[in-house]
Amino acid sequence: MKQLILALTAIACAAPAMAQDAHPTLVVGTATASRGHKATGVIKVPAGVDAGYDIPVVVVHGAKPGPILAVVSGAHGTEYASILAVERLIDAVDPARLSGSLILVPLVNVASFERIIPHVNPTDNKSMNSRYPGDASGTQTDRASLAITREVVEKCDHLIDLHGGDLDENLRPYSYWTVTGNKAQDDFSRAMVLAFGLDHIIISADRPKDPKASRYLENTASTRGKPSFTAEAGRSGPVNPADVTALVNGVQHVLMHLKMLAGTAAPVARPVWIEKVVTVAADQGGMFWPAVDRDAHVVKGARIGVVTDYLHHQTQEVLAPESGLILFVRAVPSLKKGDTMANIGTIKK
């Protein structure tokens, strides 16, 4: 009888601990990881009106329960620094030291990466960060967006979407903080952005509020009540190792902030908040000659660059429509109507 009582007592004591682990196994796509293990697999995008394909995914399922953080990159397959950062994180995070789980998606836009085509998925010519939450009856980008919504967004508690300057963008590093109007959620995501460590932060208050028309990946998580943000580093093709390191360190700082890894992450001490971004687009084609570099401060009316025809006759002087900071300036001379020549950030006073 005494042994029976002891056994029942042991079971009763163990039950609360067992009940605390809602995810003894985490499955994302074909990757299945048990506690304290790492698994690789793919998120399958089914064929439809065009071909299907596989998106690589890694699940790092920590030895202890905790939040589930998703880190995604490669929506634009030639934003190389962000892709390499997630590749490095695959080996950098040890599940034995992790409380919670990490979903890593290093390359969403496989066709863009393989064919070295910026901005869009060459299969259907759509941006892979503009079609969320996706559509099962749409083209490849729509179906991929739906697959990521179901397999990544719906399974995580928080999400970081990593980007950078594309092949034609000379970009300075910055993050985006989305303001949803939910104070508790916004305070949480703000703290995550500050922990990440990039000192220039764009305030995004105009993103769609409808979760059925969220458009952007990060916003798809945010409109579902999951504190999330976007970070960008890297530029114009060749990879600067410092940009990769900044993104890797940023994710690790957020893991510390969320108590998923041991250590402390000091928040940015003096963040530069950018309240508006003004895009300077080309109203004609030709050759673009920049007169400013990324990170330059310009006043309204200052020369950003000039456009010439193919015989080097100037056809346009490009002037700053607002005072602010050059977040990125076009990195290549090739220019067609509608192309972005610069983005100017208005700094919050």
Residue ranges and their predicted role:
Residues 10-11:
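Short, linear, compositionally biased motifs with a strong N-terminal bias
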Residues 1-4:
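Positively charged n-region of N-terminal signal peptides that target proteins for export
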Residues 14-16:
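N-terminal signal peptide c-region/cleavage motif recognized by signal peptidases
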Residues 19-349:
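Structured catalytic-domain cores with a bias toward divalent-metal coordination
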